[in-house]
């Protein structure tokens, strides 16, 4: 699907930009013809994503950081009714697979940062596998509301990377103008 591939491309571009902020050391490498000095990244990178919508953005990063470890967290929206009959949005997470994050650089990627709640829940779930030395939160689309939410709810100093910041959310908490449900656009509608 074209949307899926375009999100992957955005991931590749953002991964290159973030690579400019990693730590490098000069090392000698032997080529078939001579010895050369090259800059080699020193950061131990873990690429984390939120299933299912985050997979294409994650793949874009993995194309650039092919030695990175991987982490996956499930998160989905669930509408719940409170005692007064008001419908509230709740984020549910039921699955986590991750390596140790202790003293590693975590790049947590998700294409849509609408409210910031999924990113917060994913990050806090991943902390059960250690504390990263640095956190990069990466999205293709974000809202000011989500950015403010993360600034208030992510305790660790983090770097936030957004390709586009759209102005608002609609009543269903989708980014406007945005693109809709990234998971559905990438992989088809949920059953």
Predicted regions and their residues:
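PRPP-associated nucleotide enzymes
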Residues: 1-191
